[in-house]
Amino acid sequence: MALPKIAEVRKMSDEEIAAAILAAKKKLFELRLQQATRRLEKTHEFKHTRHRLGQLLTVERERQLAQSTPEA
């Protein structure tokens, strides 16, 4: 399974990004819980979820900066 592409995130609306950030954080929590109880089978999901969360947070921050920067 390939890592998710940032182009997919850039197509999302601000509300969808915010919801996806919450979902990714929740999934990371659940993965950590599974790892602690030794029930985690797909360890690669950590990498994919962290990668996706980073993409979401990056695009969210880019949009915040674009809105706050006055155009010259």
From Swiss-Prot:
Gene Ontology terms: biological process: translation
One Pfam family assigned to this protein is Ribosomal_L29
Q: Which InterPro entries match?
A: Ribosomal_protein_uL29, Ribosomal_uL29, Ribosomal_uL29_sf
Signal peptide interval:
none
Q: What does the entry list under GO cellular component?
A: cytosolic large ribosomal subunit
Q: Does the keyword Transferase apply?
A: no
Enumerate the UniProt keywords alphabetically: Ribonucleoprotein, Ribosomal protein
Q: Superkingdom of this entry's organism?
A: Bacteria
* GO-annotated molecular function: structural constituent of ribosome
* PANTHER family, per database record: 60S RIBOSOMAL PROTEIN L35/50S RIBOSOMAL PROTEIN L29, LARGE RIBOSOMAL SUBUNIT PROTEIN UL29C
Q: Which family does it belong to?
A: Belongs to the universal ribosomal protein uL29 family.
UniProt protein name: Large ribosomal subunit protein uL29
The protein's gene is named: rpmC
